[in-house]
């Protein structure tokens, strides 16, 4: 049962990838979706056994690293953390597979697409079930590879090529941090499996543990798109919309947060690293919320909301509230997948149009999709008693208790205001405002088939009820919850969210009568700064990439390639041989007495 949850998605990927022409588009969709349904069923049984019955399971399959220096087994670990992640990964992936069978209808490469999705799911399951760092790193690299393949699925588009390469290269920076962390762990502890490392971590010097945690956090920053290495995430929207839902809701971006939660015994021995994690998480939540406020691409608005919510999860890890971070990760998966798939339904209805300025008035054409996006947006905003309310507000309450990190609480609260503002802006521009769509496109907009709408219904139910149904299970993992927070602080996120939503409605409905900020010098400068994503791409390209390129051209190309290596390589050898042959040819003078002298 335990191994099947891992192998069945791999079987679906292999069959769809190798025999796609034999089974056809429908066959590939049905087979891969069926494999994921089986995997989801086993995940539910594993959740019942490990989480509800408190039965942790370890499975050693084979020894795959065996030397005098290090020994590592290929093994599986099923505990409460793994069980929750399996539910999230397999449920979201199953619904994305079903949605893709309709969304990708007519594409000539559907079997390849379904194969990539199943392979993506397999590597994520491998990542969350690993019992040691090297095996986790295999899944870590696997989801990175699959994200490259899926973002670049429409490989004839130059923007998709650039986005896929960017995602791969930016994540390489984080991967280097992860590799350095593994080397430091092995050097410090002499082992790489979780159980051994966590049992002896208290004996290690705090400085070494802090260094290990910072290296691990660099890996998490790359994968979970935190401040500085977040630039690949909005560009990943070049892939098909189901890919965006899978990457942002259940797989790749959650891997970094999972790494922090899994490594929590290490982080608890490094207070300085926890402070860095909190600072970066809170700044990411605020930064991404401000950028999402001015984006015009429907999918990019949701992408930046993902980045902001990941900041909340990382901030919770920095506050040592790992169970609450996992709770928000699980809740976020449902309403974020709902938002992305609903956005895919809108794009599908408008003949692949993604610019919100060219939409509007769709509430009459696709009312079902409108309802789904409203549910997802309200849950994202933390509207009372929806799924997001139980975890997002709890993170902010717990941040209030940290006096030396009080700024994290206020950044989080203000980010909640901005989240409500850009969520209402998305709804208003897409569905309520006067339409700017082309007449022939707008007149033909309609809801999709059952396999487009069924996943949305199930995700909507999750976005409404999952938080309420699972809060007692997740909260039971916590040792303590602060009982002294004033009621006003508890209500503050909701009040700020309602204020942000109301402000967005007023500004977009009556903006022409109130003010003309975007055309004023200050408003234009602020809008440009936010729309350009705080100029991060310019800063990275101008100050980092170009200088590295110049340095590489000067040292690697001119000094080494065209200098030292040429002298001791082909150019030096050729010049030496030419001189040698000239010296030898000079001996052949044609004079008899010279030859006689040489003989003597």
Swiss-Prot record:
Q: Cite the EC number.
A: 7.1.1.2
Instruction: Describe its membrane topology.
Output: Multi-pass membrane protein
UniProt-listed InterPro entries: NADH_DH_su5_C, NADHpl_OxRdtase_5_subgr, ND/Mrp_TM, NU5C-like, Proton_antipo_N
Molecular function GO terms recorded: NADH dehydrogenase (ubiquinone) activity
Q: Name one GO biological process term.
A: ATP synthesis coupled electron transport
| Localization, UniProt | Mitochondrion inner membrane
- Judging by the UniProt lineage, the source's domain of life is Eukaryota
Keywords for the protein's UniProt record, in alphabetical order: Electron transport, Membrane, Mitochondrion, Mitochondrion inner membrane, NAD, Respiratory chain, Translocase, Transmembrane, Transmembrane helix, Transport, Ubiquinone
State whether keyword Transmembrane applies: yes
Q: Give the residue spans that cross the bilayer.
A: 1-21, 27-47, 81-101, 110-130, 136-156, 178-198, 200-220, 241-261, 274-294, 301-323, 327-347, 366-386, 404-424, 450-470, 488-508, 520-540
Q: Name one GO cellular component term.
A: mitochondrial inner membrane
Keyword Translocase assigned? yes
The reaction(s) catalysed by this protein are: a ubiquinone + NADH + 5 H(+)(in) = a ubiquinol + NAD(+) + 4 H(+)(out)
The role this protein plays is: Core subunit of the mitochondrial membrane respiratory chain NADH dehydrogenase (Complex I) that is believed to belong to the minimal assembly required for catalysis. Complex I functions in the transfer of electrons from NADH to the respiratory chain. The immediate electron acceptor for the enzyme is believed to be ubiquinone.
Task: Tell me which family the UniProt entry assigns to this protein.
Answer: Belongs to the complex I subunit 5 family.
Would you tell me the protein name for this molecule? Answer: NADH-ubiquinone oxidoreductase chain 5
Gene encoding the protein: ND5
């Amino acid at each position: 049962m335990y191994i099947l949850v891992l192998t069945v998605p791999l079987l679906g990927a292999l069959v769809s990838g190798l025999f796609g022409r034999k089974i056809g588009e429908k066959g590939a969709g049905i087979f891969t979706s069926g494999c994921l349904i089986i995997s989801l069923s086993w995940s539910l049984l594993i959740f019942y056994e490990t989480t509800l019955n408190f039965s942790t399971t370890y499975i050693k399959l084979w020894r795959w690293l065996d030397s005098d220096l290090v020994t590592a087994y290929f093994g599986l670990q099923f505990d409460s953390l793994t069980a929750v992640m399996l539910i999230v990964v397999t449920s979201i992936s199953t619904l994305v597979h079903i949605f893709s069978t309709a969304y990708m209808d007519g594409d000539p490469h559907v079997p390849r697409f379904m194969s990539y999705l199943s392979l993506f799911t397999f590597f994520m399951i491998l990542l969350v079930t690993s019992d040691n760092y090297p095996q986790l790193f295999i899944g870590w690299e696997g989801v990175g590879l699959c994200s490259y393949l899926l973002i670049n699925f429409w490989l004839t588009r130059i923007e998709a090529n650039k986005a896929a390469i960017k995602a791969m290269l930016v994540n390489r920076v984080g991967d280097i941090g992860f590799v350095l962390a593994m080397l430091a762990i092995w050097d410090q502890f002499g082992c790489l499996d979780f159980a051994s490392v966590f049992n002896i971590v208290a004996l290690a010097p705090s400085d070494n543990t802090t260094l290990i945690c910072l290296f691990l956090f660099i890996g998490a920053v790359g994968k979970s798109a935190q401040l500085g290495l977040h630039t690949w995430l909005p560009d990943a929207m070049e892939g098909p919309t189901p890919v965006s839902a899978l990457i942002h809701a259940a797989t790749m971006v959650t891997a970094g947060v999972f790494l922090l939660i899994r490594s929590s015994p290490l982080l608890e021995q490094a207070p300085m690293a926890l402070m860095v994690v909190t600072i970066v998480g809170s700044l990411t939540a605020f930064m991404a919320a401000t950028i999402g406020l001015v984006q015009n691409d429907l999918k990019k608005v949701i992408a930046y909301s993902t980045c902001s919510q990941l900041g909340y999860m990382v901030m919770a890890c920095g506050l040592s509230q790992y169970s609450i971070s996992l709770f928000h990760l699980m809740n976020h998966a449902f309403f974020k997948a709902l938002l992305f798939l609903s956005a895919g339904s809108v794009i599908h209805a408008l003949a692949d149009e993604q610019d919100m300025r060219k939409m509007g008035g769709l509430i009459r054409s696709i009312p079902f999709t409108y309802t789904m996006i409203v549910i997802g947006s309200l849950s994202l905003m933390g509207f009372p008693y929806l799924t997001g309310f139980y975890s997002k507000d709890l993170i902010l309450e717990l941040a209030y208790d940290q006096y030396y990190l009080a700024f994290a609480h206020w950044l989080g609260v203000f980010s909640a205001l901005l989240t409500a503002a850009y969520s209402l802006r998305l709804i208003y521009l897409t569905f309520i405002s006067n339409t700017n769509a082309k007449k022939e496109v707008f007149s033909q907009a309609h809801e999709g088939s059952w396999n487009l709408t069924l996943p949305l219904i199930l995700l909507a139910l999750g976005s409404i009820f999952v938080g309420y149904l699972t809060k007692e299970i997740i909260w039971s993992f916590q040792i303590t919850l602060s009982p002294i927070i004033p009621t006003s602080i508890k209500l503050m996120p909701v009040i700020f969210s309602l204020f942000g939503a109301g402000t967005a409605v007023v500004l977009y409905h009556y903006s022409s009568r109130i003010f003309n900020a975007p055309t004023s010098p200050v408003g234009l400068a602020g809008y440009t700064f936010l729309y350009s994503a705080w100029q991060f791409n310019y800063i990275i390209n101008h100050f980092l990439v170009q200088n590295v390129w110049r340095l590489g051209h000067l040292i690697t190309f001119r000094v080494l390639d065209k200098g030292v290596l040429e002298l001791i390589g082909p150019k030096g050898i050729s010049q030496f041989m030419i001189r040698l042959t000239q010296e030898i040819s000079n001996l052949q003078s044609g004079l008899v007495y010279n030859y006689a002298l040489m003989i003597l």
